[in-house]
Amino acid sequence: MKNNLLFDFTVDKAAKTVYITREFDADLSLVWDAFTKPEILDRWVAPKPYVAKTKFMDFKVGGRRFYAMVSPEGNESWLIQKYTSISPKTNFKLFNAFADKDANPQLPGSDWDYSFSEQNGRTKVNITIYNESLSRMEKMIEMGFTEGMSVTLKSLDDLLSTLSQK
């Protein structure tokens, strides 16, 4: 059933942009919730063996999500996101940056644009990530961003399969 699900990851260095397209075998409402509800996000958004821990999240325009990716040894890497646009079950945009433990952003950051569409019971998510700095984007990719996104989206796929059965 999960065979032939679309996954595309493209890096455009000239535009300082990463384009990700991923298809999920789940309805749009469930996929939207998986990207917008902290209790679901924390179950998949960190690449294993890391876990995500949301300290606070206010999913509204101008709202923020502050969370950590926690290593098995307990080391925390904090991130802050600010929601800049929300069109329910269609699109949302945010600014993302690493942060210190007090939610102070460490710039430069990146602008993320998520678009959702559903066809025949499958949901396609298009993610466009514009980086303020080419060197930041190159460093993220060097640190394993491509592999990390692939692993986390696979974790989401597995989680959606479990949640769909409920």
Question: What do the PLM-derived regions correspond to, one by one?
Answer:
Residues 22, 54-57, 79-85, 110-117:
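Hydrophobic/aromatic beta-strand elements that line small-molecule binding cavities or substrate pockets
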Residues 1-51:
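Hydrophobic ligand-binding cavity/cleft-lining segments
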Residues 1-3, 132-166:
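A conserved amphipathic terminal alpha-helix motif
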Residues 28-29, 58-60, 84-91, 115-124:
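A short, structured loop/turn motif at beta-sheet edges
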Residues 4, 37-38, 62-66, 94-100:
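Short Pro/Gly-enriched beta-strand edge/turn motifs at strand-loop
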Residues 15-17, 95, 101-147:
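Beta-strand/loop substructures that line and gate deep hydrophobic ligand-binding cavities in soluble
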Residues 31, 41, 65, 83, ...:
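Hydrophobic pocket/interface hotspot
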Residues 19, 39-76:
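Short beta-edge strand/loop motif at the mouth of beta-sheet-based domains
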